[in-house]
Amino acid sequence: MNTLEHTIGNTPLVKLQRMGPDNGSEIWVKLEGNNPAGSVKDRAALSMIVQAEKRGEIKPGDVLIEATSGNTGIALAMIAALKGYRMKLLMPDNMSQERRAAMRAYGAELILVSKEQGMEGARDLALAMAERGEGKLLDQFNNPDNPYAHYTTTGPEIWQQTDGRITHFVSSMGTTGTITGVSRFLREQDKPVTIVGLQPEEGSSIPGIRRWPAEYMPGIFNAQLVDQVLDIHQREAENTMRELAVREGIFCGVSSGGAVAGAIRVAESTPGAVVVAIICDRGDRYLSTGVFGEESYSQGAGI
């Protein structure tokens, strides 16, 4: 009999109908918001907990600790509730109210750091708590079980769903788990696929992805697996996110808008390409931030 964890993965891959250039290229997007906790992070959350269980590092009833900007925390809170763990999540206090509410709804304890401390501060505090013996740190930024989830599931799904036709893979970079795992799988196939990462432009803020300082670059990231990194401005990501909703019927978050903006750039410069981008989550997590507000649309953004 299937349990909730068996509903993670095997998400749809759909072709954009009204966005993108008219040069024979195709843009396909993988709808990770269809996972039970609503994001691509469901895959990594399940992998980190299940693999730690297999190694005997954790057991139900234990306290788990993680620093998160939102989606990983929601996913971990769901898996922890399903498997009987106590979850402590640390995040900056400028993350959306919807994300906080979802974590608490699953029974997680939420510990906030200031927006000035940011994710770096959340990571430092999570490590300090683990060192004091307050729980097991899952450490998504340095845990190989994070990209392993995408090497064993997301990558193979994309390859199968495109019948091996994919020429370019585009993904926003946060923990870098998705791009690292998928690119590792694609590198092992019998054709070259160009891997493109997305990061915010200097000075831009895009929830869920980062332009990491060198000392905080996730340990799981392998630069040799990424062919190109594109800088995306916050406004471009938000406009593309809104355009996806009103032109394609895809209601997603800002980082997904950034990924599709990057995919459009790739498609425009590569006639005949088959480009796959990750839609990381759903737009309902961002309603309180105002990015879907009437003012944005009245100014012509994203339409």
Regions found by a protein language model. Give the residues of each.
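PLP-dependent amino-acid enzyme catalytic core
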Residues: 1-303
